[in-house]
Amino acid sequence: MKILVDTNVILDVLCNRPEFVEASSKVWKYCEVDQIEGYISALSVPNIVYILRKELTPQKTEQLIQQITMIFKVVDLKSTDLKAAAEMFSSDYEDALQMCQASRIKA
């Protein structure tokens, strides 16, 4: 099974968000042990760095990004995704982008 993991699922684990960490950790673990083929959007990486840099040292942030990109494949962001997301008229453009990327990779 192939899934595109939302940025917030990654942040739930890294930031230990009490209400979501258990479920998000399961998704992370399934991807880590290759029970699920996990992908993240290229857009997720700078967003994760932006959040983590407020809490962690640059070195720790770099280590976590390396770990994330070893576990999850990164889906590039294409101009077709940008256009398709804009046409979705979603209230959350970032979510619309991720839906377009997921559709493109058949996740």
Residue ranges and their predicted role:
Residues 1-40, 53-63:
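Short, well-structured N-terminal submotif of metal-dependent ribonuclease cores
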Residues 16, 43-44, 64-89:
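Acidic catalytic patch
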Residues 7, 42, 79, 95-99:
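Conserved glycosyltransferase catalytic-site signature
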Residues 93-107:
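Acidic, metal-associated active-site segment
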Residues 35-38, 71-73, 106-107:
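Short active-site oxyanion
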